[in-house]
Amino acid sequence: MRAFLIGRWQPFHKGHLEIIKKISKEVDEIIIGIGSCQKSHTLTDPFTAGERMMMITKTLENYDINYYAIPINDIDYNAVWVSCVESLTPPFTTIYTGNSLVRELFSEKNYNVKKPELYNRTDYSGTKIRKKMLDGSNWEHLVPEEVVKVIEEIDGINRIRRLSEKDYDEE
């Protein structure tokens, strides 16, 4: 069986890894959708699709997991988004998502939809990790070592800090 899992992976963290490891025990192959692939260089989406793909592939090299990592664009037409995903991916029967809109769209197309159990969401949150990066707090323990290396290679911390700078003085 092949399943689809979509996320923004901004950045790919240990919670994501645990979800993928768990799903890999339930299916033969996982299609990892790199969602909102067109977005980058913002505080909520600082990393490009290619950088996120590097984070995922370099991390999963260490695991016996059969997967495809595929960039998926957002489109402003929800009713046809599932068809767009289907055209970009190998066939699959099950989708794992925590997003209520994605659940609804795939349910309407008669897919088997499962909500993955989040792994320690208190610590493993992309929003919190990006905030730690911005604040200069310790974040490295929250992501796989390979992700730390990718972020260092692309100078990701300084990118996030530059993106947070204001072009004007706040009064």
Swiss-Prot record:
Keywords for this protein: ATP-binding, Cytoplasm, NAD, Nucleotide-binding, Nucleotidyltransferase, Pyridine nucleotide biosynthesis, Transferase
Catalyzed chemical reaction(s): beta-nicotinamide D-ribonucleotide + ATP + H(+) = diphosphate + NAD(+)
Keyword Metal-binding: no
Principal subcellular localisation of the protein: cytoplasm
SUPFAM superfamilies in UniProt: Nucleotidylyl transferase (SSF52374)
Example GO biological process: NAD biosynthetic process
NCBIfam families in alphabetical order: arch_NMN_Atrans (TIGR01527), cyt_tran_rel (TIGR00125), PRK01153.1 (NF002243)
The protein's name in its UniProt record: Nicotinamide-nucleotide adenylyltransferase
